[in-house]
Amino acid sequence: MADPQIITIPCLQDNYAFLLHDPSTGATACIDVPDAAPIQAALGAQGWTLTDILLTHHHWDHIDGVPALVEATGAKVWGAAADAHRLPPLDHALAEGDTIRIGALEGDVMDVSGHTVGHVAFHFPAATAVFTADSLMALGCGRLFEGTPAQMHGSLEKLKMLPPGTLVCSGHEYTASNARFALTIEPDNPDLIFRVERITAARAAGQPTVPSTLAEELATNPFLRADAPTVAAPLDMEGADPVDVFTRIRAQKDSF
């Protein structure tokens, strides 16, 4: 059987949407719809038919293109039941632990509240990918507009348990800025230093830095490393609860 295919689609100023395609059935899902036009262009270039739309959370820059894309394709819309009142009309309302099917591909729904309450991620083991939008991001995590630091930390702890080779398909090209901040937390982390060099080269060449891998994030993302002594020590928080360390890091990033 042919492997699932994932395409990263730049949208708006710095957003990403993703197409997930199951070659065995022809089913194709779009994860988040910042703008319909670039997604339709990508579908046309691949010769794929959109069957499903998966929404991670209610922010406008992740859902504004949904009406136009539904009108053009008739795709079914999936999203969190808890967020249904702030999402476009849903054909399938979801909660943590639910399984979704895109063709022959099964995906697990994860509650990753923090950036918003009701934010979900979609983990597709057969595609070795998790679509995290504004929860776990490349070298960062989403700003806490609605949830608490404890909620976001708990969400990230769930994501940390996925296989290290999992592709982290996050929702924005914020990686260069996140890298500059990460270096203020762990300036001597050799994995981070090497990753920043690759990020700088990719952006100079106009290439996306998303998706990353969970292994990269575990080694370099300060928001996944609140339990690491090398992260806590510069904050004078040795031995502190990782939730408190995470809270401090998030506060520093908010004013960075």
UniProtKB/Swiss-Prot annotation:
InterPro entries: Clx_II_MBL, Glyoxalase_II_hydrolase, HAGH_C, Hydroxyacylglutathione_Hdrlase, Metallo-B-lactamas, RibonucZ/Hydroxyglut_hydro. Zn(2+) 1 binds at residues 57, 59, 115, 134. It catalyses: an S-(2-hydroxyacyl)glutathione + H2O = a 2-hydroxy carboxylate + glutathione + H(+). Thiolesterase that catalyzes the hydrolysis of S-D-lactoyl-glutathione to form glutathione and D-lactic acid. Keywords: Hydrolase, Metal-binding, Zinc. The lineage of its organism: Bacteria, Pseudomonadati, Pseudomonadota, Alphaproteobacteria, Rhodobacterales. Its EC number is 3.1.2.6. This is Hydroxyacylglutathione hydrolase. It is an enzyme of class 3 (hydrolase). Zn(2+) 2 binds at residues 61-62, 134, 172. It comes from the Bacteria. Pfam families: HAGH_C, Lactamase_B. Binds 2 Zn(2+) ions per subunit. Pathway: Secondary metabolite metabolism; methylglyoxal degradation; (R)-lactate from methylglyoxal: step 2/2. GO terms for biological process: methylglyoxal catabolic process to D-lactate via S-lactoyl-glutathione. It comes from Jannaschia sp. (strain CCS1). Belongs to the metallo-beta-lactamase superfamily. Glyoxalase II family. The gene is gloB. Monomer. HAMAP family: Glyoxalase_2. Its cofactor is Zn(2+). GO terms for molecular function: hydroxyacylglutathione hydrolase activity; metal ion binding.
